[in-house]
């Protein structure tokens, strides 16, 4: 359905437009997107005539500050936090509204020789302030446009325009696919762009390393930090991990289960079972800071409250406005690659974890089951994981 990110990047490099689609649970929209430094009056005219949305120019915060172009409002109450700045025109434009004068303004925004006094305000071009870190920080069209320009080796700025149907309603995916076919444009998703960046960029750095004696044996503990977010994770290494395939457990943080001994889940039991087996056989335990299947500790406690009222773990997440599972494993894959591991035997009951690790370039040669005997408090939880989340659990 969607084109390859590599092909889209090549089109951006050549000055072509593409269509970028965001998540159906977000805006569920498609934008025409191209590199700002490649724009012409013809491109702007196409966007106005066929896209029909608002022509905007996503740029970095650094560049906008250099040009003295600041936020449109001090308190941004837009529900998607789209960071509009004051609109601008290039000072030598007449009205600034024609397709060709708008293109001139865009070109001057990315011209290294431009100065703040070269622009009049307000105008007819709407710069947007992209978040540092791009789509890995905010999964919006603003960040996607800047990311694509950078990946194409161009200046970090794009031109975007929403696609609206003939009847005035927003074009959704079926309409966008038809639009792409009609005009011969590539179409990609922001989700695929996120995966591309996660797979091809280094997003963690090794910060510290020390010996860690435990009741399961003597481990080496290695501390990692995510470059974009500062979030911290650790890996416990036992024995020689140069002999592949390596036994691996990727464990997501669970304060209530891992530390407080909660009987509501099987997390603590799984953690200690994994440490014991790795302590005996050698291997790696990656401990990820994504509490509550990614929704955070306080939201997990809210989910517990809903479960006390009869909802299951999936229903509780959805009631709170979250997917059943928000966890991601790209950081774990990068940690394993940093350690030098590529071929693994993964201790998990979660097939999605295997799929994601494989997508990020690891060779998963075996799934090692990690069965925990259910108790009165977590039996419903385990059944829900098995029946609704596809976990390969035999004991319930």
Curated annotation (Swiss-Prot):
Gene3D superfamilies: DHBP synthase, GTP cyclohydrolase II. Zn(2+) binds at residues 254, 265, 267. Mg(2+) 1 binds at residue 27. It catalyses: D-ribulose 5-phosphate = (2S)-2-hydroxy-3-oxobutyl phosphate + formate + H(+); GTP + 4 H2O = 2,5-diamino-6-hydroxy-4-(5-phosphoribosylamino)-pyrimidine + formate + 2 phosphate + 3 H(+). In the N-terminal section; belongs to the DHBP synthase family. Catalyzes the conversion of D-ribulose 5-phosphate to formate and 3,4-dihydroxy-2-butanone 4-phosphate. Catalyzes the conversion of GTP to 2,5-diamino-6-ribosylamino-4(3H)-pyrimidinone 5'-phosphate (DARP), formate and pyrophosphate. GTP binds at residues 249-253, 270, 291-293, 313, 348, 353. It comes from Thermoanaerobacter sp. (strain X514). The record marks 124, 162 as: Essential for DHBP synthase activity. This is Riboflavin biosynthesis protein RibBA. Its EC number is 4.1.99.12, 3.5.4.25. InterPro entries: DHBP_synth_RibB-like_a/b_dom (IPR017945), DHBP_synthase_RibB (IPR000422), GTP_cyclohydro_II (IPR032677), RibA (IPR000926), RibA-like_sf (IPR036144), Riboflavin_synth_RibBA (IPR016299). Its cofactor is Mg(2+); Mn(2+); Zn(2+).
